[in-house]
Amino acid sequence: MNGEGRYLDDYARELAEQGERAFRKQHAAPVLIVIGKRARKARRGSGVDTVTDRPTLHGLLHRVFPLPGVAAEGAGPVVIGRAEDDGVDVIIPEASISKRHCTFAVDAGRVVLSDCGSTNGTSVNGEPVAATPVELAGGETISLGRLQLTFETAPGFVELVGSMRTRSR
């Protein structure tokens, strides 16, 4: 999949046009949604990372990246990276993401995230992903380099998009 993803608003329109049943059927895989980027740590002060949504995200804010290979056991890992490379399944065009940054896979019915030895690291809810894969349930904040994303299961994504539609009425 290339880096030309769709945005949350596109999915909200699609849900309104298709109805929930058809939308659920069509979107049966988990997704990553860009929610911002980590601010650089201040040299003085608390040193706490914060998430910003400045326009420096170059069109990535609220972009949705489906993870279709994560929908079924035994499908093999889905590789996330920044460049078109052999074996990269989902391309996120952000300089702080490595060419082959991380993988998502299904293991014993659980979605797990592993770092591929990326230069700028991977974290889940602020905790670095070490050598052991991290289990995901949905709703986690994932940092890939400086980019902040949320991981949503397919049902969680449908619920999120549905809540957007309800709020906009």
Feature map (PLM): residue ranges:
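Short linear Ser/Thr-Pro motifs
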Residues: 86, 96-98, 118
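C-terminal boundary/linker segments immediately following FHA domains
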Residues: 1, 106, 117, 123-169
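Intrinsically disordered, low-complexity acidic Ser/Thr-rich regulatory segments
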Residues: 1-92, 156-169
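Catalytic Cys-His active-site segments of thiol-dependent hydrolases/isopeptidases
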Residues: 80-82, 113-117, 143
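Buried hydrophobic-core signal for structured, non-transmembrane domains
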Residues: 102-104
